Amino acid sequence: MVKFLEPTANEIKENKLYQDMGLSDKEYDKVVDILGRMPNYTEIGIFSVMWSEHCSYKHSKPFLKQFPTTGERVLMGPGEGAGVVDIGDNQAVVFKVESHNHPSAIEPYQGAATGVGGIVRDIVSIGARPIQLLNSLRFGELTEKQNQRLFKGVVAGIGGYGNCIGIPTVAGEIEFDRQYEGNPLVNAMCVGIIDHDKIQKGTAKGEGNPVIYVGLKTGRDGIHGATFASEELSEESESKRPSVQIGDPFVGKKLMEATLKAITFPELVGIQDMGAAGLTSSSSEMAAKGGSGIHLELEKVPTREAGISPYEMMLSETQERMLLVVEKGTEQKFLDLFDHYELDSAVIGQVTDTDRFVLTYEGEVFADIPVQPLSDEAPVYILEGRAAQFDAVNHDYSNIDAQDTLMKLLSHPTMASKNWAYSQYDQQVGANTIIKPGLSAGVTRVEGTKKAIAATLDGEARYVFNNPYEGGKMVVAEAYRNLISVGSLPLAMTDCLNYGNPEKPEIYQQLADSTRGMAEACGALNTPVVSGNVSLYNETKGDAIFPTPVVGMVGLIEDVDYLVDFKPSKGDTIYFVGEVKPDFGGSQLEKLLFNEVAHTDVAIDLEQEVARGEAIRQHIIDGKLGHVQAVGKGGVGVKLAQIAAYFNTGLEAQLDVSDAELFAETQGNYIVIAKQGKEIDIDGAEAIGTFGTESFKLSTNQGEVTLDVNRMTEAWKGAIHACMTSEV
């Protein structure tokens, strides 16, 4: 019998070794109460990952309960690997967003690559074929070498995995701000399509049913990855490089295809990806959802090397693995399938009726834990928050140089073209991509139909820091507008909540207020939350990131035919829809001129968002519009310049605003370009100019901005290239 040298239960207690795993004294005591004895080394490791912030949401769960999660189209909401929403004709869209922030800070290529791989497996575990990838990325300012290195590595990792596995990257966002120095945000989203009768759940039930492991052999990579993702980054974080998982997209592709075949077998009982906390979370969660027990015989787990202990097996986050429960007597059918795809697989245990999570190795018991308390009784913390205090600041915007300001904003990497990154992603694999990255939302045809899925992934930070409640509403509305801009009906959303240490009162209050705003917007815009992720402790040496909720939203296009002519032409009329107010607090103009965030009472009208959005969407479907863009960062001035640069053509517009108000970021506004001869009936729409002129010209109440189109386009397209040409 193999002997593993591990601390005893007494040594764990006396030396408080559980603290190194992320458990507090009170949490350790709760484990003792649940077990009725002191836990051994494997057991305390299991509790530490299952009760980590990453797996248990112990600081955010009360806020997540505010979100509306049901609707007439929602087939499956939070609690499974991903959300499932009906799109008609017995089909559904499956989607989720996940974070891989901490791993990407330490090992950017693998951190990003495994983030993509993990979210793909979440979608596949439901039984859906992935059709879209999206990503939301944030780094420190691109003038710094370290940020260039992180950016380069993350983009390469996303492309390296996504391109190999054969899923197009269709949309996303990339921003740069000093608040993300040392703590980049890497959020990945995947969207898939499934028939209703193929939807799977991660459940283990049926006494005696075998448990099958399939995928890469288990190694020591990623041990305590979930715990690592639940703590602040520090100078010691580099030593935790082994906590970063290693991806293998070629095995990932084979696993995806094998899984999609396995879900067609009626003998499949349940399936779940081995993601955060690996074999521990997948097996214990499946047992909990099935109201069953589970017994794993760990000597049967395929391992990469000899001598891997039960503790290491259970906490490893080796990638490209799935766990299945199948009907007793049919296991060989599944093993033969996986052998056909040249994947390692084995029966490693069985479902029991004991309600216990039991782990043995060659007959020796290494863990015996009640299932429900492990899965469902993680502590939940309700803390005292405190609103951040802002000094009263009244910045003077009266004497800006509009032309110089426009060029500076347009060429800042946050607002410049992201083609440097998108060109490294396969955008067309599968031949169903209709709208590629770079515009409001990605659009992908549903194969064999006239339908299409529009998807967007949007985050907000400076406004959430400025006013968390209103900022929370804004991030949901931004995603809604981006889907409206391609004529789709917004259906539902997934969220990724990226914040600092929730044990700090101001950050806890940011989380509380912003999620309240998000929940209100979800209700008003009829976009229920069907899946999501929380990433807390995003701090470096005690400095927190801006609170950054990220929203992934999907929309339905019933008939893609209108998209054939959805493009602007020379002579089309440009309309501005909305109104401009002197809203500068949290804006990119404020950042450019003063490099800070001043508190303002910026607000959003959700009722108006719905009315305006519906009107614009109907105009697109009716073929009256050639292009639509929601006005966002940089205001109407930057948005018009981006449109001109994207199409490399001039435009002329006259606006009843001051020079500074060209860059005000008043919420709810759009630029729409109407086709010649088409009547526009949108409340708040005003004709402001013409598309397709020789030069780029904006007139304000104070003067005129005139720019050479080629110069402007080169500045917009070349900004990130210029930063990345130096050796990184």
Curated annotation (Swiss-Prot):
SUPFAM superfamilies: PurM C-terminal domain-like (SSF56042), PurM N-terminal domain-like (SSF55326). Substrate binds at residues 99-102, 121, 245, 317-319, 535. This is Phosphoribosylformylglycinamidine synthase subunit PurL. Pathway: Purine metabolism; IMP biosynthesis via de novo pathway; 5-amino-1-(5-phospho-D-ribosyl)imidazole from N(2)-formyl-N(1)-(5-phospho-D-ribosyl)glycinamide: step 1/2. Part of the phosphoribosylformylglycinamidine synthase complex involved in the purines biosynthetic pathway. Catalyzes the ATP-dependent conversion of formylglycinamide ribonucleotide (FGAR) and glutamine to yield formylglycinamidine ribonucleotide (FGAM) and glutamate. The FGAM synthase complex is composed of three subunits. PurQ produces an ammonia molecule by converting glutamine to glutamate. PurL transfers the ammonia molecule to FGAR to form FGAM in an ATP-dependent manner. Mg(2+) 1 binds at residues 98, 533. It comes from Macrococcus caseolyticus (strain JCSC5402). The gene is purL. It is an enzyme of class 6 (ligase). One of its GO terms (biological process) is 'de novo' IMP biosynthetic process. It comes from the Bacteria.
